[in-house]
Amino acid sequence: MQRGFTTRPASPPRLSLLQVPEPKTAKNRLHLDLRVSGEGTPEHKWSRVTDEVAQLSAAGAVARHTFVGHHVVMTDPEGNEFCVA
């Protein structure tokens, strides 16, 4: 059985992330923009973004470009890009 991660929001759509044995060979066909939850001032939201980036970095992701106050472009361990905002 392959390991994976599935989100289950209150309503569809669902998202499944699965490990595959093949290495990345081309540009991503899918780019995820992940949004942190919660309310508050722009400073509070940015603090939550940087906290999430720290957690993702600890799990193996790498921050590539930071647009302070807005979003961070990251890559997973296989080089696939995604953004955290």
Kindly give the residue locations of the regions a language model identified.
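Vicinal oxygen chelate
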Residues: 1-24, 50-85
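Short Gly/Pro-enriched loop/turn and capping motifs at secondary-structure junctions
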Residues: 22-23, 37-39
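Short, conserved charged micro-motifs
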Residues: 40-48
